[in-house]
Amino acid sequence: LDQFKQEFREVFFSILPVTLVIVLLQVTLIHMPFSDFLQFLLAALLTIVGLSLFLFGVKLGLLPIGESLGSSLPHKGFFWVIFFGFLLGFVITVAEPDVRIFAQQIEDAGERIATQNVLILAISLGVGISVVMAMLRSIFNISLTLLLIPSYILVFVLGYFVSDDFFSIALDAGGVTTGPITVPFLMALSIGVVSVFGGRDKVSQGFGMVALASVGPVIAVMVLGVLFS
């Protein structure tokens, strides 16, 4: 219960400034219909309660299981590291709320660029492949620079072959993957993998998976753009 109170307090003081700014705008400039304003206040309250419960659940279950899986997979063999690394990255991204909201907004824009499900699939595939790369990096002690620099070079090369719409969407796709589900789970997973190998620096080797998980969807959506073109 104390842990939940702490999460509630942190979320409350995070949401409060945004709520106060909206209230100030309502009083001074916007003057939205009163029913809409009440709906916003109710939504703010639900957000505080819901996010508090979510973060409580993440710290209670998601982080420990992520670290446990990360420390167990390297013992099961190379194939299982690749298979479950990809599978975990894929399904955790499919469940990511930010990704779904992003894909829905693209579809609602009405530009017929790609459907919501196609975008979610492409982004999830990109994260899945990135998680595999990150886990192999931790196992074989590969420098993060050797993976990130070629990845971003590939991003800009692909940028010449996609439309401006897909280029913008692809770059934003890398940001939406760093959501409240994906980030804590992947960080715990990465630290769990590194903990298996003695003498490894948990900072230099345990972190960086989120960076790789961000560039993977960018490349995946750009490849989708090349196929669509």
How would you describe each model-predicted region?
Residues 2-12, 37, 162-229:
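C-terminal transmembrane helix-loop-helix hairpin of multi-pass membrane proteins
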Residues 60-77, 102-105, 110:
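Flexible loop linkers connecting adjacent transmembrane helices
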Residues 9-29:
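The first (N-terminal) embedded transmembrane alpha-helix
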Residues 26-38:
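Short, hydrophobic transmembrane alpha-helix segments
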Residues 80-158:
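Helix-loop-helix junctions within the multi-pass membrane cores of secondary transporters/permeases
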Residues 54-65, 92-102, 165-166, 227:
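Transmembrane alpha-helix boundary signature
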Residues 35-53:
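Loop-to-helix transition at the N-terminal end of transmembrane alpha-helices
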Residues 17-22, 50, 76-86, 149-161, ...:
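Small-residue-rich segments of transmembrane alpha-helices in multi-pass membrane proteins
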